UniProtKB/Swiss-Prot annotation:
Belongs to the PPR family. PCMP-H subfamily. Disulfide bonds: none annotated. PROSITE patterns: PPR (PS51375). Residues 876-970 are annotated as: Type DYW motif. This is Pentatricopeptide repeat-containing protein At1g18485. InterPro entries: DYW_dom (IPR032867), E_motif (IPR046848), Pentatricopeptide_rpt (IPR002885), PPR (IPR050421), TPR-like_helical_dom_sf (IPR011990). It comes from Arabidopsis thaliana (Mouse-ear cress).
Length: 970
């Protein structure tokens, strides 16, 4: 723009001068749409035809009709006004439909008539049309061609820049107007200028404009006031915005919506709804009932706070006010339901919406992506791409879909998406290119990640962060450290995101030395002030097991955020200290810190690891007291916690009580049934899940396979493994194969299990799979295979005592005592010790522990006495000590005596002594329950008429009336 503009201080002087002048600078010739004579039937009919054509979108027919009426410049005044009004309707329709080609045809038609092109009203309409079509340069061209410019035309061009978010140009034009003309801004000018100030980082300019508003006496104007409220809210000055709102002499619905949005955007969720209630209470006559803009403003609050109840209430208002057909509102509702974990509700709205736009599709793609549902994400995406030319995917679509490809099994889908993006030239967008770099790295396709990265013309810190972050989350995080060195060579310095990725890589590598180097760089460059960086440092030391350092860093934090508390709780949990994790939780409660759903997840996780159903119930009570029970994360954690504490009935109650079931909640319940060996229930729930429209994911199949494994359903387990691959396109991981191999091995199909390892698995078998095979070799006394598997285990984990114990037990079962002695001698030479069997039971808010063979504990004589009675009773029912469970070369009498000292028997007997009749006994054991204790517990449950629940390190056993839930298959 070639113009010499005055700085703002001089502009103030000009304003003072102009306001002292008597004459008004405002033009008086205002266009009046009623200027056509009302008794002109033909004229009215003509305008109705034009209006109808515009409403139906038939702009070509409308244009041809108007074109016939454009005559010479000497036509009558009435005819001229008629044509002008018709052209105005057509220009407005072209702008609404963003039909710039039609707009240009009209512009050309107007330019051909001297009288039309000199008409102020039409010129203003043309400027506005180009603005609506997203072409502010054309608006400016028309404006600059005007010989004389009135305020409406200045407002139109300022509005054009504002509408298209060219905020620098807005201010330049505004200053040009007040510097070079005698015109004073009005209540149409200022809202556009103030909006521009809101979109700029320099708050001072907005404050200066506010000063001009005060000088011109427009501060009490409702339109200007609304703009100022939004300006202060956008820059985070919530108190100032509220003060302006409170002193407004007149408020319209936009005023209320603006203030509600200020609260919403600045995280004042409760205040948003309180103000909404105040708006409706003050105007009970319906004058200010919520409109689409109101509801669209409060829905993100519901999503952010995961307040599904409030979200449904807003949805109810939409239906009641008959706004539920509005596209923008439906899109907001879909977004809210998706972010609250209710993807099914979002799908229902999506399917019922016949007028979908790209935002609708993007919302659904993003919803499935946020759930980690790759199958659902690509289903919606393919439907969108198959829809023809009506709706086209854009960069946002790709950015929503790409993150869901985070594993090598999703590489084909990622490549498919990449091809489409290349064809549409989306990859030239830096954000899209960065997303592909990160996802290719996460999927392990480093060559593709590098190829996309090198294709970025101008690499920024963000580009390097995408590569470094992707490598950090890949199977080889060392590559992120190499990329960091290349970044430094290129002359770019790491930022907060870079160091967070590097810390993540060090955490995965458990490299304390490298992590400390990164921490040193952070301290030297004052990056510790960034909360995310500080939390990443905490996470590093947590992964490296440096809990003293974690506690010291946490204690040094002046302002402890909720996330920092959660990080420390999770850290103790990950390092096997659930009691300390609960101690931190108690501190939070004492300090009055309000926990959210996500915060409670590690608390329930800690309760799952401790032998205390009581603690879990207390945590549940806390969630109920603070109205967190409807949170999707809480629901899943509760289901999991009760299942792992042996109360599968309570898990089922929580699940069945959910109003909205997410994929995660289905998975938690299926896995709960799985670890309890309730295969029929797990399979039934799996089928019901699919009927309700939820797509199973890899965790769903893990739960089903676990259930089949614990129940010995080999045929069904293999069928579900095949279905996972063929029907759902999911690639089994090591956990899935571990279930299948354990299932085959315990059924005696050892050769088949070994073939699965050798032929079907794309990854190298981990120690868990080899341990499972060795355990199966022990059960079925397959010495040859057992020794080969043990050799593999010793190669992978040479210092794990349980590997030697498994081999020793195999030899003992075959009576090869000399080999047993050699294995134990080798363990002694390596200073390896077998974990002693230990069991726990909670009684009267205390946890009692029992170690195998322990004879010096309080109440031992009482335990010994009751066990003698119990042994006598169950012997009459057929109990015979299973001395094969003793892995030592002893006499039969010595073996029987050793069986009596097993920790689960001690805990069970003590529980019977200390509890009243009919009470369920819950025992927790660190190792797998032996055959002898299993047989004894079954018969004791019948003799004593008690339900006994034993959780060992593999699964749950529910003993009742002489029967175990595992069906003697474990």
């Amino acid at each position: 723009m070639a113009s010499v503009l005055l700085p703002l201080p001089q502009v103030f002087v000009l304003f003072d001068y102009r306001r002292s002048r008597k004459e008004s600078s405002f033009p008086r010739a205002v266009y009046n749409s009623n200027s056509i004579s009302s008794n002109s039937t033909n004229a009215n009919h003509f305008l109705r035809r034009i209006s109808n054509f515009c409403e139906t979108g038939d702009l070509d027919k409308s244009f041809r009709t108007v074109q016939e009426f454009v005559g010479d410049d000497e036509s009558s005044s009435d005819a001229f006004l008629l044509v002008r009004e018709a052209l105005g309707l057509l220009l407005q329709a072209s702008g609404k439909r963003k039909d710039i080609e039609m707009g240009r045809k009209i512009h050309q038609l107007v330019s051909g008539s001297t009288r039309l092109r000199n008409d102020d009203v039409l010129c203003t309409r043309i400027i506005t049309m180009y603005a609506m079509c997203g072409s502010p340069d054309d608006s400016r061209f028309v404006f600059d061609a005007l010989r004389s410019k009135n305020l409406f035309q200045w407002n139109a061009v300022i509005s054009s820049y504002s509408r298209n978010e060219l905020y620098d140009e807005v201010l330049e034009t505004f200053i040009e107007m007040i510097s070079t003309t005698d015109l004073l801004p009005d209540h149409f000018t200022y809202p556009c200028v103030i909006k521009a100030c809101a979109g700029m980082s320099d708050v001072g300019i907005g404050l200066a404009v506010h000063g001009l508003v005060v000088k011109t006496g427009l501060v009490e104007d409702v339109f200007v006031g609304n703009a100022l409220v939004s300006f202060y809210g956008t820059h985070g000055f919530v108190t100032d915005a509220l003060q302006l709102f409170d002193i407004m002499p007149e408020r319209n619905l936009v005023s209320w919506n603006s203030m509600i949005r200020v609260f919403s955007d600045n995280g004042f969720s409760e205040e948003s709804f309180l103000l909404l209630g105040e708006m409706m209470e003050e105007n009970g006559d319906g004058a200010f009932m919520p409109d689409v803009a109101t509801l669209v403003t409060v829905l993100p609050v519901c999503a952010r706070e995961r307040e599904i109840g409030l979200g449904k209430g807003v949805h109810g208002w939409a239906v009641k006010l008959r706004l539920d057909k509005e596209l923008v509102l439906n899109n907001a509702l879909m977004d809210m339901y998706s972010k609250c974990g209710c993807i099914t509700n979002a799908q229902m709205i999506f399917k019922m919406n016949n007028n979908k736009n790209v935002v609708s599709w993007n919302t659904m793609v993003g919803g499935f992506s946020a759930e980690g549902d790759t199958h659902g994400t690509f289903d919606v995406l393919r439907q969108m791409l198959a829809g023809g030319e009506d709706v086209k995917a854009d960069e946002v679509t790709i950015l929503n879909a790409v993150p869901v490809c985070f594993h090598e099994s999703f590489l084909p889908s990622l490549k498919e998406l990449h091809c489409y993006s290349l064809k549409q030239e989306f990859v030239y967008n830096e954000l899209v290119a960065n997303a592909f770099v990160a996802s290719y790295a996460k999927c392990g396709s480093l060559s593709y990640a590098q190829r996309v990265f090198h294709g970025i013309r101008s690499k920024t810190v963000n580009s390097w962060n995408a590569l470094i972050g992707g490598h950090a989350q890949s199977n080889d995080p060392r590559l992120s450290l190499d990329a960091h060195l290349q970044m430094k060579i290129s002359g770019l310095l790491p930022d907060s995101f870079t160091v967070c990725s590097l810390l993540s890589a060090c955490s995965k590598l458990k490299s304390l030395r490298l992590g400390k180097e990164v921490h040193g760089f952070i301290i030297r460059n004052w990056l510790e002030r960034d909360l995310f960086v500080y939390l990443s440092v905490l996470s590093l030391y947590i992964h490296c097991g440096e809990l003293c350092t974690v506690q010291a860093l946490f204690d040094a934090m002046e302002d402890k955020s909720l996330v920092s508390w959660n990080t420390v709780i999770t850290g103790y949990l990950q390092n096997g200290f659930p009691d300390r994790a609960l101690g931190v939780f108690r501190q939070m409660v004492l300090y009055g810190i309000q926990l959210c759903g996500i915060s409670m997840m590690p608390v329930f996780g800690a309760c799952s690891l401790l032998p205390s159903l009581r603690l879990g119930r207390e945590a549940h009570a806390y969630a109920l007291k603070h109205l967190l029970e409807d949170d999707a994360f809480i629901a899943c954690s509760l289901i999991d916690m009760y299942a792992k504490n042996g109360s599968i009935t309570q898990s089922s109650k929580v699940f069945n009580g959910l109003k909205e079931k997410s994929t995660a909640s289905w998975n938690a319940m299926i896995m709960g049934y799985g670890i309890h060996g309730l295969a029929k229930e797990a399979i039934k729930l799996f089928e019901e899940m699919q009927r309700t429209g939820h797509n199973p994911d890899d965790l769903t199949f893990l739960g089903v396979l676990t259930a089949c494994n614990h129940s010995g359903l080999i045929h069904e387990g293999l069928r579900y493994l095949d279905q996972m691959k063929s029907s759902f396109g999911l690639k089994p991981n090591l956990k899935h194969y571990a279930c299948v191999i354990d299932m085959l091995g315990r059924a005696g199909q050892l050769d088949k299990a070994l073939r699965v390892v050798a032929e079907e698995m794309s990854e190298e078998a981990d120690v868990g799979i080899w341990k499972s095979l060795l355990s199966s070799c022990r059960i079925h006394q397959n010495l040859e295979m057992g020794e080969k598997v043990a050799a593999k285990l010793f190669e992978l984990e040479p210092e794990k005592p349980e590997n030697y114990v498994l081999l020793s037990n195999l030899y003992a079962g075959l009576g090869k005592w000399e080999d047993v002695r050699k294995v134990r001698q080798r363990m002694n030479e390596m200073s390896l010790r077998k974990d002693a069997g230990c069991s726990w039971i909670e009684l009267n808010r205390k946890v009692f522990s029992f170690v195998v063979g322990e004879r010096f504990l309080d109440g031992f004589e009482e335990i010994k006495s009751l066990w003698s009675i119990l042994e006598m009773k169950i012997s009459k029912m057929g109990y015979r000590p299973d001395t094969m469970s003793v892995q030592h070369d002893l006499s039969e009498e010595e073996k029987i005596e050793q069986l009596r000292g097993h920790s689960e028997k001690l805990a069970l007997t003590y529980g019977l002594i200390k509890t009243s009749e009919g009470t369920t006994i819950r025992v927790y054991k660190n190792l797998r329950i032996c055959v002898d204790c299993h047989n004894a517990a079954k018969l004791i449950s019948k003799v004593m008429e008690r339900e006994i629940v034993v959780r060992d390190n593999k699964r749950f056993h529910h003993f009742k009336n002489g029967v175990c839930s595992c069906g003697d298959y474990w």
